[in-house]
Amino acid sequence: MINGRSVISRVIDLANSSNASNLYIATDSNEIMDHCKSYDANVVMTSSDHISGMDRIAEAARILDLPLEIPIINLQGDEPFMPVQIINQLPMLLSKDTPISTASIQFSNAIDLSSPHEVKVVRSISKKAMYFSRAVIPNSFTGEYKNYWTPSIDFESNDYISEQIFYNSKDDTKI
């Protein structure tokens, strides 16, 4: 709770204040669904078997029958302080072949890097997100952590945008 209101209700308000044409909450929780509906949010119920939030988003996009060219901004339910300017900027930074994007910045301190509350991303040289983890990846045996990134954005420098490509593991088709 933040000043007597749930975090997710604040995220719903934030998303509604953006330029997004549609807002959907993807969840597997009836409790979250009921709570979000009390704020007039659209809710898509998804499987509880997902390994990651991106898997949940891919399922929600399939349920909603969204065309691949529709940009999807993944605003986490625990990000009530994301600047709305960033939410509004992200669709313009997506490529037509990669409709889902996560922004990332380099960690500035070891405390955040070690925190399981901060998501880490491994990026390819071309800045494509390869995978995410709440643990430090790869594990450092020396205790020195250099070149680690977190899914967020440096609003002043679009150099840190990571695109993501999703594949259907059954037949290796792009989602």
Predicted regions and their residues:
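Short phosphate-binding loop-to-helix
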Residues: 24, 30-75, 79-92
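Active-site donor-binding loop signature of nucleotide-sugar glycosyltransferases
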Residues: 4, 46-48, 77, 123, ...
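N-terminal glycine-rich phosphate-binding loop and ensuing alpha1 helix
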Residues: 1-27
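Residue-level detector of flexible, active-site-proximal loop/helix-junction positions
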Residues: 6, 50, 79, 107, ...
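Short, high-confidence coil segments that cap the C-terminus of an alpha-helix
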Residues: 20, 68-69, 96-100
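Conserved core of the sugar-phosphate nucleotidyltransferase
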Residues: 82-175
